[in-house]
Amino acid sequence: MATAQLSHSIKIHKASKETVFPSQITNEHESLIMVKKLFATSISCITYLRGLFPESSYGERHLDDLSLKILREDKKCPGSLHIIKWIQGCFDALEKKYLHMAVLTLYTNPKEPEKVTEIYQFKFKYTKEGATMDFDSYSSSASFESGTNSEDIKKASILLIRKLYILMQNLGPLPNDVILTMKLHYYNAVTPHDYQPPGFKEGVNSHLLLFEGEPVNLQVGLVSTGFHSMKVKVTTEVTRVSDLENNLFQENSTTEIAHQGLDFDEEEEECNNHVRQSCSESPLIASVKKKRKKDFPIYFFYEFRK
């Protein structure tokens, strides 16, 4: 049942480029489908461009001028099945409106999982407000606001994916072997104490994550449908990031992760002093393939600039 759910959520008909995301978003159900697809596409992009799984673990889909690699079930690659199971668990928590944040972490030493190489944060909110998209950087900011206009939401989502693709190609190569884990953080007020989505178990309440060098926070973007919003943020060491034009992704502080850990808003911290977590049932070890490149136009970044 869960496998069918994932396949349905990211399935794309070859006859149309528009079916990567829903053609319209007029209600909460369509919004949920949109957020699921955006989340699954983002995870697929990360794992593909970081060379974590073989080509056979991905199918190719197209959205406008983007060629997307989407994770699919590959029985020859247990690691990809692991990731798909984690995505399914996130879908379950999203459907129930429990999921606050999903954190994908890459590290190298199984005895020191707190010493990380890369962190990918996906932060979710459930709202009734209009669609917004906001990007921050040292030197400039770009914002785009509207009501729940389906075309605008699609443009915002494509922009987020473009930024994620470019960021993945500007990160330094990973070590030959890395370990992946995923932790989920919930909204305590609505999440049952004993809730665990498929593929996850009770986690330890700790936000402490360490980098060997100076960390930098890279804001990829935030997309809101009017019913859901998803914010994407990447953290790694400064020395692993190269050639990011105009500091497009960077936050105002490169040391935030060292002091605050994960990306919780101040008001959320006050209400979630004892945030319950789930963690993936077992870490995933991946042998990194050669770093992949995907070529596509980058002009889209500047359409919303003022």
Swiss-Prot record:
Gene assigned in the entry: HORMAD2
Complexes and interactors: Interacts with HORMAD1.
Post-translational modification note: Phosphorylated in a SPO11-dependent manner.
Protein name stated in the entry: HORMA domain-containing protein 2
Entry-linked Pfam families: HORMA
Keyword terms, alphabetized: Chromosome, Meiosis, Nucleus, Phosphoprotein
GO CC terms of this entry: chromosome; nucleus
UniProt xrefs under PROSITE patterns: HORMA
